[in-house]
Design a protein with these regions (language model features):
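Bacterial N-terminal signal peptides that target proteins for export
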Residues: 2-15
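General secretory precursor processing signal
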Residues: 6-8, 67, 95, 154, ...
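Bacterial N-terminal signal peptides
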Residues: 14-23
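Sec/Tat signal peptide C-region and signal peptidase I cleavage site
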Residues: 25-29
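Flexible low-complexity loop/turn motifs enriched in small/helix-breaking residues
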Residues: 30-101, 105-125, 194-199
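Acidic, small-residue rich beta-repeat scaffolds with periodic aromatic anchors
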Residues: 31-51, 58, 62-63, 133-199
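Short, surface-exposed coil-to-beta transition loops
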Residues: 96-100, 127-129, 152-157
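An exposed acidic His-Trp-rich patch
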Residues: 111-147
Length: 199
């Protein structure tokens, strides 16, 4: 009888502990930014179902569409440059493929980034659609490749370098360092890039 009366409090305590553990795990899993590695390496998202809700809402508002097939080749990347807010680079389908970048603000909202682009030497504009974006965590560079729907058409590649001293600025620490132009061949990329501007 003593064993039975003692078993009930222990069972109740064990079930309470398991419930608390499940609650803590669920709370931890609810914040998708916790999945972003702290060392600049990207978290690649290859399925629309895995896109964090706040980002999915921002993409819908911007009419930035992805498909399952496109995301296998061009995944969404979430990364955290050292000393900066987490950010996302996203491919979008349209007449040509283009990209958008967002910074996750402290309150959980997203802010679209407008990058400096140089359509002509010496002329700088800001654009939220600088091109298809790629992050290199080792070099701490973000490249934007302007796509083209014409075979053998001229394309532009902008390179932005991350500087943690400017992690909280308008571009989340990125500055334009190089602009190149080249022609993409009908069968893929050519190695004919010419530097148009470099800082």
């Amino acid at each position: 009888m003593l064993y039975t009366s003692m078993a009930h409090p222990f069972t109740h305590l064990a079930l309470s502990a398991l419930g608390l553990l499940a609650f803590l795990q669920a709370s931890y899993a609810q914040d998708p930014l916790d999945r972003i590695p702290p060392d600049g390496q990207p978290w690649r998202i290859e399925r629309p179902a895995d896109v964090p809700p706040a980002l999915a809402a921002a993409l819908k508002q911007a009419d930035c569409r992805q498909s399952e097939a496109m995301m296998v080749t061009f995944p969404i990347e979430l990364f955290r440059p050292a000393g900066a807010r987490p950010m996302a680079i996203v491919p979008c389908s349209g007449i040509t493929l283009y990209g958008r970048a967002y910074v996750f603000e402290r309150d959980g909202s997203l802010r679209a980034l407008a990058f400096p682009v140089m359509p002509f030497p010496g002329r700088v504009n800001a654009s939220e659609q600088a091109g298809v974006l790629a992050w290199n965590p080792d070099a701490k560079t973000l490249t934007a490749l302007e796509s083209n729907d014409v075979c053998e058409g001229t394309v532009t590649r902008h390179t932005y370098r991350y500087d943690e001293r400017h992690g909280g600025d308008d571009l989340n620490g990125f500055a334009l360092v190089k602009v190149e132009r080249g022609k993409l061949g009908c069968n893929g990329a050519s190695e004919n890039w010419q530097v148009m501007w470099e800082n």
